[in-house]
Amino acid sequence: MKIESTLSFIFILLFTSSIYGYNKENSCEKLMQNGNNLEAVDAAKKIKNQYDKHFCLGKAYYRSNMHELAIKAFNDSEEGAELPADQMFSILYKGIAERDSGSINISSKTFTRGLETAKLGNSKYLQMERRFLYQLGQNALSTNEYDESIDFFSKSIVISVNDDERAEGLDRLSLAYYGKKKLDKAIEYALKASNMYLKTGDLNNYADKQLNMATYHLENNAPDRSLRLLEKLEQFAKDNGSQYYEAKALLEQSLVFKSKGDEQNAIARFNIGFDIAKSIGAKDLLPPKK
C-alpha cells in the first residue's frame, strides 16, 4: 500500500482489440513510460502515422502541463482517426485536457459529443459510453451539480464490465451523495466501493474509502462507528505494511476522540500518528505537534 495522488487523466489504454488502431509500442509512448515527456514530444513529431503522431503528441503535451497544445493535438488526432474507437479516445482525452485547462463547460460538451458517438455503435462501444458517462459525472461533481453527477455515475455503473469499473463508479457516487449531505447514502455507497476495492486488491483506494466512511459517520453523529472503522483500518494498515495509513488512521482517531471530549486519548493518538508520519517523511500528515 502507498499513497496515490488523484489523477484525472487516463493513461491505461485498452488497445488490445482489433477495434483499436493506435500503436502503443511507438517511441513516443516508450519515452513517456520512462517519464521523458519532452523527449516524447520530439519523438511523436517523427511518427509517420498521422493518428499515432497527434494522439501521442497530445498525451506528451498533457503530461508536460501544456494543456492548450494537448487539446490541439487531440483535435488533430480525431481528424486523422480511421477507426471509431480511436476517434472516441481522442474525444475523451481532449475533454479531459479541456477540463484541466479550466474549460469545464467546453469539456462537458466534448464528453457529450463523445457519448453520442459511442451510442451509435449500440453495444459495441459500451466501454466508451461508460468512460464518457464517468467523465461527465466528474465534471458535474467538480461544479457541485450533485444530482447530475449522481445520474451520470449511476448510469456508468450499470454498464461497467468489471469490478474495477464498478468500484470507481461507486466511489464517485458516494462523494456525490456526500456533497448533497445525504450521509446515509454516502455511507452506503462508500461501503460498497470499499468492499469492491478490497475485492480487486486495490488497497490504497480501499483505505481511502474507509477514511471517507469514518468522516461520514462522524458528521452523521456516530463517533463510535467512526472510531471502530479507524481502529480496524489502523490494524489493517499494520497487517499490510503501510505506515502511511497507520499514521493517517491514528491522526483521524485523534479527531474523533477530540469530538467526544476525550482529550487524553486524542493527544495520545495524535502523538503516535505524528511520530509515525514523521519517521516516514509523510509531510502531508504533519500538522504542528501539540
Predicted regions and their residues:
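Short coil/turn linkers that connect adjacent helices within long alpha-helical scaffolds
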Residues: 47, 80-84, 120-124, 159-163, ...
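Residue register of alpha-helical TPR repeats
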Residues: 52, 89, 127-131, 168, ...
